[in-house]
Amino acid sequence: MGDVDKWIEDVKKCKYLPENELKKLCEMVCDILLEETNILPVSTPVTVCGDIHGQFYDLEQLFRTGGQVPHTNYIFMGDFVDRGYYSLETFTRLLTLKARYPSRITLLRGNHETRQITKVYGFFDECFSKYGNANGWKYCCKVFDLLTIAAIIDEEVLCVHGGLSPEIITLDQIRTIDRNGEIPYKGAFCDLVWSDPEDMEYWGQSPRGAGWLFGHNVTKDFMAINNLNLICRAHQLVNEGIKYMFDGKLVTVWSAPNYCYRCGNVAAILSFETAEKRQTKIFLAVPDAERVIPKQNTTPYFL
């Protein structure tokens, strides 16, 4: 663990690893992820987090708010990269923690953890500008391919990046998805990372062009069939950091404060003492005086 401990200390300072060391780290994490099921069982206490999007200094604020790993257990519900200034450092920070404390931190796949999306929204360009080639991005994409789809807390609370799918009736259908690879353009896997809840009864077409809008009755039926008490998801900016829907049965958690350095929103994490007993913790963006803003950002970060 000597290498990993050194990496943890280096990356805490918002430094990225040399290319050969990133390769080694990604290979270590891939070996861990290969052992994880599509729905990873997690026990309380645990803290659930939403999108981070490369906002490294705000991720550090999240850890100050919720507690450091390994003293606090975490589930991060995807979208670690793109749009923020420090996607590489942010993802590397989470990977070092996963390598060192694999049972203390769960990393779920978001819709941004794909080759296609990261080529458009900043992560590819950032890796290329920092390493001078695409190798670092390729190593990270191999990790993306293996990130688990969902987590279930105490067999009662389902955590997933986006939402539900008309092709998924039971949790066992999620367990049988072949997740090792790019997320398809349509189908169950795609829906789980792209769908959004909407104030409606059943299913609707998503304006995102991927996934679905899913309503109250759909959610209620899915939860009854699978003996769930709550669904946690991320994927949508919430100005208050957290938003409950469907009679409190579904919650959106957003963990990137002042999203894209301009939205003015607060962020939240959801701390579960037990599956029933939980506490929302709100935090603000780190002041500009306490963060380093790159002199040149070649990729538009708000698209």
From Swiss-Prot:
Annotated GO CC locations: cytoplasm
Quote the subcellular location field of this record: Cytoplasm
What Enzyme Commission number(s) does the record list for this chain? 3.1.3.16
Q: Where is the active site?
A: 112 (proton donor)
Report the principal subcellular site.
cytoplasm
Keyword Methyltransferase belongs to the record: no
Question: Catalytic activity, per the record?
Answer: O-phospho-L-seryl-[protein] + H2O = L-seryl-[protein] + phosphate; O-phospho-L-threonyl-[protein] + H2O = L-threonyl-[protein] + phosphate
Sorted alphabetically, the keyword list is: Cytoplasm, Hydrolase, Manganese, Metal-binding, Protein phosphatase
Locate the transmembrane regions by residue number.
Answer: none
Q: Which GO terms describe its biological process?
A: G1/S transition of mitotic cell cycle; mitotic cell cycle; negative regulation of JNK cascade
SMART domains this protein is in? PP2Ac (SM00156)
GO MF, one example: metal ion binding
- Where Mn(2+) 2 is bound, by residue? 79, 111, 161, 235
Pfam families associated with the record:
Metallophos
* Positions bound to Mn(2+) 1: 51, 53, 79
- Function description: May be involved in controlling cellularization or in regulating transcription of the genes involved in this process.
Its family remark reads: Belongs to the PPP phosphatase family. PP-6 (PP-V) subfamily.
Q: What's the protein name? A: Serine/threonine-protein phosphatase 6 catalytic subunit
